[in-house]
Amino acid sequence: MSRQHAAYIDYALNRMKKMPIEMLGSDTITLKPYQHFVAKVFLGLDTMHSILLFHDTGVGKTITTVFILKHLKDIYTNWTILLLVKKALVEDPWMNTILKYSPEIIKNCIFINYDDKNFHNKFFTNIKTISSRSRVCVVLDECHNFISKSLIKEDGKQRPTKSVYNYLSKNISLNNNKMICLSATPIVNNVREFTMIVNLLRPKIIQFQSLFENKNLVNEKELIDKLGGICSYIVNDEFSIFDDVEGSQSFAKKTVYMHYVNMTKQQEIIYQKAKIAEIKSGIASFRIYRRMAATFSFDSFPDKKKKTIDEITLELGALYKDFVNYVNKKSFSNNAIKLFKSGKGLTGDSNPLDISLLSELRQKSCKFTEVCLKILASPGKCLVFEPFINQSGIEVLLVYFSVFCITSVEFSSRTKDTRIKNVFEFNKESNTNGEQIKVCVFSISGGEGISFFSINDIFILDMTWNEASLKQIVGRAIRLNSHANTPPNRRYVNVYFIIARLSSGEPTVDEDLINIIKTKSKEFFQLFKVFKESSIEWIYKNKKDFYPINDESGWRALTSRVVDVNVKSKRTVQLAQGQNIWFSNSSRMVTIHKGFKTSDGKIFDVDGNFIQNMPINPIIKIHNDKLVYII
């Protein structure tokens, strides 16, 4: 059926061929060809009521969307635009972009924050005010967050956001309304999110049942066929977050390092107490205490089972004050800082006060100490991701920065009033080399919707629960032309996963989370492939054998067909001669995959999916007594 989808895409492009490629407002911008393509297809089909912009961070999803909103009047005169976004993203990028390039539509825009606890009430209140003569265009930014808030809880209770989800799913397709969903990571935590977002875009075409059997999609072909044209797919980095990616004229090179640091004896003691406390309290699966202890350990671990929350808060506050008082007004000597900046450590001839201070700081946090040393040795600006803010998180990290004489700004929930200005100062061209502000430390609040320029090193101090969040974090620094002002020899980003290690060799919470991420990624990769091959770009490029059409009367029927996941696609089993191999996409072998190489040089993964042909002169390395091909 993809040929039929291609015919409708071609019809839309012809219908909108006179659409300008420039967007004029108080400023002027020329769209990239891929942005213009999306706009022409979406606006060229009146009955194409929804689309997912599955675009990498930094390729211009916001610009594409604002261009579409600007030209809604080309197909109908009266529109109400509902922008459902996180509060942190209203001003920048949305308000700023609209006011710069399409100020005339601002009077038609209603912003509603879906991270507001009263979101659903505000949504339905605004819906009631919309004139019956007006069509509605909904923009759902970072739609994976909205989907996550719409999932039914494990106890079976429906979240308030689900009522908004149900309304959009039912009503957007009526009266030629439109909806644009934006995300660089449309599936984050669970494969159920795939079904949720598909049914939001194409109501009720997938039933809530398992799409996988033994971690393999039951019917990939059926999904691709029925979901044709559901999204626009612009993903330049299809590699795992743990793999290296070569740079290009527009994007910086990415190099990944698994950087292991050994806990001190004191930190190990607190870490083991945290582990026991998790087991006793029944929250071991969340690993909160261990994650905090692996990052920073106070001199004692509060017994949280015998105390109230207020008592625990007071005790942690006292421990924090004790630590601050201890290091207050302490800092390393100029000679020590010079050594650290040159990438060297202290020696026996160094100032005893410097040696003692470094030892004390490392006793409490092997991670914070190591990151500070690497920041000072970095030639450019740095980002540090730390999800925790109070107790053992950003609050303490900033104390370490002070001792190491590191200048920084913070982007987190506690800096809401200043964080946009902080990032603006950090991104200034005059600060390209980090001479005024060396580091921006950010929590999960900084994982979406903001951009950083001329970053050379990213340090991830604590893992998220999924690869998608990690991609969002790294994607803040590797964006289209993000390193344009950086000297050519520094157009790279080193990504360091800082992993705490126990002397016993027992896996730590950091290593546990990495394994969880890798397990989830296998299923997500297959679903992303479905999005790719059902995208308007893939169809138009690969499906040339179609009959031109003169109207769009059949589009709604074509895109309303129900997916039958119970019918398994036929698999052709073929025998091939060859050998089992190990391969990696990274020369540092961050992730190693098991595969099969045929006698004629074709490489397949363990599920029989073709990867690529073996290079003529392959690079082979040895890792844990395995011969590993670097491809």
Curated annotation (Swiss-Prot):
Its EC number is 3.6.1.15. The keyword Nucleotide-binding applies. Residues 367-536 form the Helicase C-terminal domain. SMART domains: DEXDc, HELICc. GO terms for cellular component: virion component. Transmembrane segments: none annotated. One of its GO terms (molecular function) is DNA binding. Its main location: virion. It comes from the Viruses. Residues 42-204 form the Helicase ATP-binding domain. GO terms for biological process: DNA-templated transcription. Disulfide bonds: none annotated. Pfam families: Helicase_C (PF00271), NPHI_C (PF08469), SNF2-rel_dom (PF00176). ATP binds at H55, D56, T57, G58, V59, G60, K61, T62. Residues 457-524 are annotated as: Binding to the cap-specific mRNA (nucleoside-2'-O-)-methyltransferase. It catalyses: a ribonucleoside 5'-triphosphate + H2O = a ribonucleoside 5'-diphosphate + phosphate + H(+). Keywords: ATP-binding, DNA-binding, Hydrolase, Nucleotide-binding, Transcription, Virion. Monomer. Interacts (via C-terminus) with RAP94 (via N-terminus). Interacts with the cap-specific mRNA (nucleoside-2'-O-)-methyltransferase. DNA-dependent ATPase required for providing the needed energy to achieve the termination of early transcripts. Acts in concert with the RAP94 subunit of the virion RNA polymerase and the capping enzyme/VTF to catalyze release of UUUUUNU-containing nascent RNA from the elongation complex. NPH-I must bind ssDNA in order to exhibit ATPase activity. Belongs to the helicase family. NPH I subfamily. This is Nucleoside triphosphatase I. It comes from Yaba monkey tumor virus (strain VR587) (YMTV). The lineage of its organism: Viruses, Varidnaviria, Bamfordvirae, Nucleocytoviricota, Pokkesviricetes. The gene is NPH1.
